[in-house]
Amino acid sequence: PAVRLSGAYTLANLIDEWLTDPSLPEQVRREEAQTIIDALTGCIRTPYPLAQKRQVLEADEAPEGYEGDFTRDQEALREEQLVRRTVFMEFSRRLAAVAESPEKDNGENQQTVPPISPMWADLRFDFGGAPIFYPLRQLYFQNADFASATFYGPADFSGATFHGDTSFSAAQFTTDASFHGANFTDWVGFSAAHFAGAAEFSGAHFADAASFATVTFTGGADFSNAVFSAAADFAVASFESDADFSRLNTAGIASFAAVTFDGKAVFTASTFHDEAHFAASVFNRPAVFSKSLFGGVARFAGVVTKQSAMFSNVRFASAADFSGASFTQYEDFGGARFDGDATFSRASFIALPRTRYEMDFPQRANFDNAAFAQDADFSKATFTAHVGFYKATFARE
């Protein structure tokens, strides 16, 4: 692939030449550079039939019954991967230089001829619908559009940095995907994407709003230690396997409204600084929120937990709304503290074992019309302000 690699390097350098040509107006320089960018990203979007065979061709031996010349296909795939990844690496090298030292020219990059123009940050990179079949870890991206892209084999963006608005909307991840430690400095959208394998977002940082609305996670989803500095939207997402949000930190509104959790959902020791919405969500396996902090309003109205629901030692610093919630098995609110008004009106507690509610309510607590199908023990609960059990029903021993 020497000729194609040389072409990629030449075109990348030509972009630099256009952007740094002082004889041309900035608009002209930017338009000419964008034209070359569009040509290179067009190559990335070109279909490649062997991409679908990536995992087979990256094996040591051909599987029984393989159609075609396995060795030749392996070589062809490796060459195509090298060429396409080189395009990303050339983009990344320049974008990293702009991001790390956008204003200064202290001679550190004197070996780069021509110099890197800060106008690289204004360019758009359209990879929409592209087949991606190679790792892109630890690269820099700017204004990247991966909408409707298909990732064949493991999608590796671990340690990557994304500047500018980024879209993975309706992207298809055919197997495992890793965004471990990735850094998104601006808006990012994964809405309607599908993760067929494990989705790894542990330690990822989202500096602006992030949308995972209507995403389907077929494999396990790991958002442990992820940081969302603005809004985090997971509304109507579907988690078909275990979901790990332990030690999650959200600074903006976090929405998990109408989400379906078919696997175990773990939010242990998480911090929600703003409102947290779990209204109408369904937990088909254990839901664990132990030791978490809800700094804003916590909305669990209409939530359904079909197995254990663990809220032990949770602190609700503002109002908590569990109206109409349904707890069908064991629920544990031991040591939970409600600093704001707590509403459990019309909630159903139908777990079988006797439950002791060792909860602290400094403000109003509303259990009006709640239904307790098991023996409920509030002897260890602390009610400092008004408490209401109007028309609440309790099981008899």
List PLM regions with ranges:
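N-terminal leader/targeting and pre-domain segments
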Residues: 5-12, 17-397
